[in-house]
């Protein structure tokens, strides 16, 4: 199975990114002009948390706003129109693993040229949301808020208000284009003294400065000088920037096995491999292998060539055929088509966490700082809530004795009052966690298999279409007690619509836990091999301080942790859908999106904020925080 190069840490250059284009229109805007209609312009801001994340400098904005909002751009002025359809669009990077908060403000322009100072122009309204909400619905309509109001998402039964409405449409700017081809080697140089080589290929993108970057590696073929690798697929943007003539480097290596127990993790395990030869090509040349005869590329070993001189011919030949460009459905295609992400969380209540009333306990509730479990829960759920229209989660605990019970519960509903795992919103998860902490007896052991099997059973009911995909978050303080059973459960679940995120809290040595996160090779046990990699494991301590012993703000910890644990989810979802042959539903006819329960309060989950008192001079009522459904 071909494997992409695993990311080591996450930088802006390596994180999966999609560009989305926003188109904006408005209706029934206020008319603030005496002798004509308003001349609206829309400004788009992003909450950047003090980081440089935009292309322009901050503009002057109303005084109630803070300096962390940065302008991403502005539309043209549409003259004399209360229902403008702006032609200027906005191209924004979209990251699944980030909360990208946007603000849309509409003004009645006092002149065709709107400068940095906005005070001469009448303010018509604003709307705040996260980019995830827009892409989840493809088209998002909302009431505009006046004064300090932030607007409210439009519901089916709503009527027009005096402030008017805004409609934002999101489209993926470019689809995921890949080149697919078959490749084999013939007559490769023999590198092993006692046997044949174990060859694999590296595909590298060459940059203008002469440097090269590894973008794809094939599997290793054992003991052969005439290997045939599995069909290769590489994103053309990653491979060559979609430039048909940009040089592409293909390296062939003989893999040297390490002694059992000595093999390093990651790229280090390829560090002592022998170079067989290198070929140079382009995207256009590779595509010629799709019509007629295969493309033949000679492998050259410069050291061997220099040594043998004119007697040197080559170090083998690569043949490439069945080449073609394919466009696969993307994560946003499925999300825009109504695919819902279902979420379950499981919290470790074993005694090794320490007595909750003790300040050294990992479950200790501090008045001024969240504990590591709370940080982990909010980090993941604050992102994931936008991809589940029902705003409900399943919350479990494990490794504790429940009230009036003499036996340990391998798995139990976190909501002890209702006895059901389903809770509403992040606030529901946090309330259930705190209540359980006060009423259960921490015990043990740390077993993962029961919770994985329980959630996998639910995922089993989702295998018939692309309507739902399950994610399980497990938070634990130590090494699991049932490693063999857990590996078996993960392998059993690897063919289901399921991703598992494991976050380690505390200072335990989690080295063995990395066995579950099989980035380098698929998880296996005895003769059974997982169908795909569905586990992501990280330790939270890596994100708690800046490396110099200074603890970071909890919001920063949550943001960085979410980036690390969630960035693989889009690829896991699309990988599963491809494996099953599922296509996304069209945007015009999406899967049904369920509404939240009547008692759901988005403000408690950090979506929006309470309406504030209007500034002096404003007569319009202030819109409440948006119920995001």
Curated annotation (Swiss-Prot):
Positions of the VWFA domain = 342-561
Supply the alphabetized keyword list: Calcium, Cell membrane, Membrane, Metal-binding, Repeat
Single Gene Ontology MF annotation: metal ion binding
| Alphabetized SUPFAM superfamilies for the sequence | C2 domain (Calcium/lipid-binding domain, CaLB), vWA-like
Lineage, top-rank taxon, reads: Eukaryota
Per UniProt, Ca(2+) 2 binds at 33, 108, 110, 122
Q: Which residues are involved in binding Ca(2+) 3?
A: 192, 198, 254, 256
Q: Where does Ca(2+) 4 bind?
A: 192, 254, 256, 274
Biological process (GO), any one = receptor localization to synapse
Domain (C2) ranges: 1-144, 162-299
What GO cellular component entries does it have?
A: plasma membrane
**Pfam families xrefs:** C2 (PF00168), Copine (PF07002)
Q: Where is Ca(2+) 1 annotated to bind?
A: 33, 39, 108, 110
- What membrane topology is given? Peripheral membrane protein
Q: What cofactor(s) does the depicted protein rely on?
A: Ca(2+)
The yes or no answer to whether the keyword Calcium is present is yes
Query: What is the annotated quaternary arrangement, including any partners?
Result: Interacts with nicotinic acetylcholine receptor.
Q: Which PANTHER family match?
A: COPINE, NICOTINIC RECEPTOR-ASSOCIATED PROTEIN 1
Function summary? Exhibits calcium-dependent phospholipid binding properties. May function in membrane trafficking. Regulates synaptic levels of nicotinic acetylcholine receptor subunit lev-1 and unc-38 in the nerve cord. Involved in nicotinic acetylcholine receptor (nAChR)-mediated sensitivity to nicotine and levamisole. Affects directional sperm motility.
In Swiss-Prot or TrEMBL terms, this protein is called: Nicotinic receptor-associated protein 1
Q: Which species is listed as the source?
A: Caenorhabditis briggsae
């Amino acid at each position: 199975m071909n494997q992409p190069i695993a990311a080591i840490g996450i930088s802006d250059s390596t994180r999966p990114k999609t560009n989305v284009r926003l188109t904006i229109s408005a209706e029934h805007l206020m008319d603030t002009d005496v002798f004509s209609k308003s001349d609206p312009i829309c400004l788009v801001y992003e909450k950047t948390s003090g980081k440089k994340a935009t292309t322009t400098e901050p503009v002057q904005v109303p005084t109630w706003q803070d300096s962390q909002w940065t302008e991403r751009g502005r539309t043209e002025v549409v003259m004399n129109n209360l229902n403008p359809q702006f032609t200027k669009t906005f191209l924004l990077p979209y990251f699944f693993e980030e909360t990208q908060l946007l603000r849309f403000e509409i003004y009645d322009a006092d002149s065709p040229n709107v400068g940095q100072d906005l005070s001469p122009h009448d303010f018509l309204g604003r709307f705040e949301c996260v980019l995830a909400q827009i892409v989840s619905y493809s088209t998002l309509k909302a009431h505009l808020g006046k004064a300090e109001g932030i607007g409210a998402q439009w519901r089916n039964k709503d009527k027009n208000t005096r402030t008017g409405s805004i409609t934002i449409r999101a489209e993926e700017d470019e689809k995921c284009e890949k080149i697919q081809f078959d490749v084999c080697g013939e007559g490769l140089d023999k590198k092993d003294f006692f046997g044949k080589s174990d060859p694999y290929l590296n595909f590298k993108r060459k940059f203008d400065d002469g440097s090269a970057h590894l973008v794809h590696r094939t599997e290793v073929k054992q003991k052969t000088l005439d290997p045939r690798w599995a069909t290769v697929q590489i994103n053309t943007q990653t491979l060559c920037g979609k430039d048909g003539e940009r040089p592409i480097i293909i390296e062939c290596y003989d893999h040297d096995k390490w002694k059992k127990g000595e093999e390093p993790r990651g790229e280090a395990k390829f560090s002592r491999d022998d170079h067989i030869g290198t070929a140079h090509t382009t995207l256009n040349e590779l595509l010629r292998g799709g019509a007629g005869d295969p493309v033949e590329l000679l492998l050259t070993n410069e050291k061997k060539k220099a040594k043998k001189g004119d007697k040197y011919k080559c170090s083998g030949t690569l043949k490439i055929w069945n080449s073609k460009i394919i466009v696969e459905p993307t994560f946003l295609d499925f999300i825009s088509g109504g695919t819902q992400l279902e979420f379950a969380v499981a919290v470790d209540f074993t005694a090794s966490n320490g007595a909750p009333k003790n300040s050294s306990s990992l479950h200790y509730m501090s008045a001024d700082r969240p504990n590591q479990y709370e940080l982990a829960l909010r980090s993941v759920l604050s992102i994931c809530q936008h991809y589940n229209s029902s705003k409900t989660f399943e919350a479990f605990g494990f490794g504790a004795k429940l009230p009036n019970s003499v036996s340990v519960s391998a798995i139990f509903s976190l909501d002890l009052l209702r006895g059901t795992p389903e809770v509403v919103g992040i606030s529901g998860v946090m309330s259930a966690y705190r209540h359980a902490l006060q009423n259960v007896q921490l015990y043990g052991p740390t077993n993962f298999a029961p919770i994985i099997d329980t959630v996998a059973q639910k995922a089993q009911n989702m295998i018939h279409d692309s309507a739902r995909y399950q994610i399980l978050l497990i938070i634990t303080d130590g090494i699991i007690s049932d490693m063999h059973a857990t590996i078996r459960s993960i392998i059993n679940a690897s063919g289901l619509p399921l991703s598992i995120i494991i976050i380690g809290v505390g200072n335990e040595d989690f080295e063995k836990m990395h066995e579950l996160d099989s980035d380098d090779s698929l998880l296996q046990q005895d003769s059974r091999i997982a169908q795909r990699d569905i586990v992501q494991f990280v330790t939270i301590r890596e994100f708690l301080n800046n490396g110099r012993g200074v603890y970071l703000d909890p919001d920063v910890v949550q943001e960085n942790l979410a980036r690390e644990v969630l960035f693989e989810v889009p690829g896991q979802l699309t990988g599963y859908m491809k494996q099953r042959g599922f296509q996304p539903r069209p945007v015009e006819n999406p899967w049904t999106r369920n509404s939240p329960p009547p008692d759901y309060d988005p403000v408690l989950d950090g979506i929006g904020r309470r309406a504030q008192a209007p500034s002096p001079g404003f007569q319009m009522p202030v819109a409440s925080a948006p119920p995001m459904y």
